[in-house]
Curated annotation (Swiss-Prot):
It is an enzyme of class 1 (oxidoreductase). It holds the Pfam family 2-Hacid_dh. Catalyzes the NADPH-dependent reduction of 2,5-diketo-D-gluconate (25DKG) to 5-keto-D-gluconate (5KDG), 2-keto-D-gluconate (2KDG) to D-gluconate, and 2-keto-L-gulonate (2KLG) to L-idonate (IA). Keywords: Cytoplasm, Gluconate utilization, NADP, Oxidoreductase. This is Probable 2-ketogluconate reductase.
Length: 334
């Protein structure tokens, strides 16, 4: 644990993830006392609990901020997540205590769309599979069809969840790869339809006609196992399934079955039901899936921008400004 003191300690901020020193200094220059954990682990968890007893603000990600944690922070005025998703935060308790929860939308749209596009290409063209075989010394002459992949360009992509990330992904698919774009969403997005000739279709139509299914759904009880046996059975056997939204939206048992039985051709995952992925997961034994350790936003540039946004969000919230990036602003203002 690194404790950074300040002459004007009117408010105490606990940062529970490593952020750039310039951002720590920005908080200090605002008059805050800052305590930083890089990150929370079994060796410093008790120190963290002790620190939040006097905390007015929290900044971080990954670590679960549940009722137990919040009960140890009686003076808490704001929580600022270095993420877009907020399923690691007990929103019921935060709402009840009128504590604003800030997050960092928009800043990661491009990096998320890039990782999904990368997964589409890697799975379709068997890049990881071919790399593995080359390293095993299997390239001994002309290639047989087991090395061959599928085209990406001019195919149909079905985007499930047309939010900010979905819109940026649609742009890449349409403008970069001349793909036909369809999307499933509660409401229509006329801008996407106009710019990228995207079609708003029902779920069954998208599942049965798309070459690529790309999932960017948020995590909630409503979307838990949104994709299970029934959904995979409706897909083309040449379909490729990509998920970089939330792991809970996919029933991994059903996905494994679809991959093993040839119901779909392949898959690419950046998120999982349980993270880190269990070392004995059957997903690790399959050659027709590409697995990434939740790195959708893990670029140096995006991580810094997200951290900077989270710091700015916290400062704004502690100054009473909830107009931007506040998840529960409508509850707080009641």
């Amino acid at each position: 644990m690194t404790s950074i003191k300040n002459n004007n300690e009117n408010k105490h901020i606990v940062v529970y993830r490593k952020i750039h020193q310039s951002l720590i200094e920005k908080l200090e220059n605002q008059g805050y006392k800052v305590t930083q954990f890089e990150p929370i682990n079994s060796n410093n968890i008790q120190e963290f609990y002790e620190a939040i007893k006097t905390a007015n603000g929290l900044i971080g990600s990954v670590f679960k901020i549940d009722e137990n944690v919040l009960s140890k922070a009686p003076f808490l005025e704001c929580v600022s997540a270095i993420s877009v998703g907020y399923d690691n935060y007990d929103l019921v308790v935060l709402n009840d205590r009128k504590i604003p929860l800030m997050h960092t939308p928009n800043v990661l749209n491009d990096s998320m769309a890039d990782i999904m596009m990368g997964l589409m290409i890697t799975v379709a063209r068997k890049l990881a599979y071919c790399d593995k075989r080359m390293r095993n010394g299997e390239w001994n002459g002309p290639l047989d069809k087991s090395w061959f992949g599928l085209e990406v360009h001019h195919k149909k992509v079905g985007i499930i969840g047309m939010g900010r990330i979905g819109e940026v992904l649609a742009k890449r698919c349409r403008m970069g790869f001349d793909m036909e774009v369809a999307y499933y969403s509660r409401s229509r997005h006329l801008k996407v339809e106009e710019l990228y000739d995207a079609k708003h279709q029902d779920l069954d139509t998208i599942l049965s006609t798309s070459d690529f299914i790309c999932v960017v759904l948020p995590g909630s009880q409503e979307t838990k196992h949104f994709f299970s046996f029934g959904q995979f059975s409706k897909m083309k056997n040449s379909a490729i399934f990509i998920n970089a939204g939330r792991g809970m939206t996919v029933d991994e048992v059903a996905l494994i079955d679809a991959l093993e039985t040839g119901k779909i051709a392949g898959a690419g995952l950046d998120v999982f039901e349980k993270e880190p992925l269990n070392k004995d997961s059957k997903l690790l034994t399959l050659d027709n899936i590409v697995l990434l350790p939740h790195i959708g936003t893990s670029t140096i540039e995006t991580q810094h921008i997200m951290s900077e946004c989270a710091v700015n969000n916290l400062i704004s919230a502690l100054n009473g400004n909830l107009e931007k990036n506040c998840v529960n602003a409508s509850i707080i203002k009641k």
